[in-house]
Regions:
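Glycine-rich phosphate-binding loops of nucleotide-dependent enzymes
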Residues: 1-233
């Protein structure tokens, strides 16, 4: 818009909220008008040396797919994985979550792990926000509440859905998920709000290690800022 436009009309929630002269308006002003609040494209950099090791992957190998050794994550650290598409990032995260069979040797806290399933991983305090949230992270026809509570429902033996509302309301509110009712299908939400529900699922459960695979894909700048803020929290 800044490169080819003369004027910009910004709409939000079905209404015009501003008309701007491209020569004088800043990118930040346009974004604030679109989102309804000021946002940072990137959160301020924070140095966190961690408080001791949490995860140590000594080996994670699938013949012809990945061959990884010596990855360490400290408690409180944010560790990024970089690489081109197909480099193995998603496969490694799926392996750590127990969703891919592999030659595995890793330690999580005091637990030595050589074999893992997703059920066991969740029990150990590992959560995964997958790259394809619609196919792998959500039950689109189920309610927002059921999706947010699904990882935490098992311990609720008595009146589970009432307990789910109590446990899931704080993370949904904290993440700023926009919905008419927690009983509406999660598939009706925007991509950014769907991603927040996936994240709320693990916040409701309470985990030690959160694996994020392309977490900002398909999100608008406001949803990205919200996600960055929670990851840094």
């Amino acid at each position: 818009v800044k490169q080819i436009g003369d004027r910009a009309t910004v709409m939000r929630d079905g209404a015009t909220v501003g008309v701007f002269d491209i020569a004088s308006v800043t990118k930040e002003e346009l974004v604030e008008s679109m989102i309804g609040r000021a946002v940072q494209a990137r959160p301020p950099r924070r140095h966190n040396p961690g408080s001791g090791p949490l995860l140590h992957v000594r080996r994670a190998a699938i013949p012809g797919v990945i061959d990884i050794d010596d990855i360490t994550v400290g408690r409180g650290e944010i560790v990024g994985l970089a690489g081109l598409g197909g480099a193995g990032r998603s496969t490694l995260l799926a392996t750590i979550f127990g969703d891919r069979k592999a030659d595995l040797d890793m330690t999580l806290g005091d637990e030595h792990i050589v074999s893992l399933t997703p059920r066991t991983a969740v029990g150990l305090g590992i959560g995964l926000v997958p790259e394809d949230r619609k196919r792998q992270g959500l039950f689109l026809e189920q309610s927002i509440l059921r999706n947010a509570a699904i990882a935490a429902l098992t311990p609720f033996r008595i009146n589970p859905m009432a307990r789910a509302r109590e446990v899931c309301h704080p993370p949904l509110t904290r993440l700023g998920v926009k919905f008419a009712s927690v009983d509406q299908p999660v598939g009706l939400l925007s991509g950014g709000n769907q991603q927040k529900v996936v994240l709320a699922k693990w916040m409701a459960r309470g985990i030690d290690l959160l694996l994020l695979d392309e977490p900002t894909r398909g999100l608008d700048i406001g949803a990205k800022a919200d996600l960055f803020e929670q990851v840094h929290a």
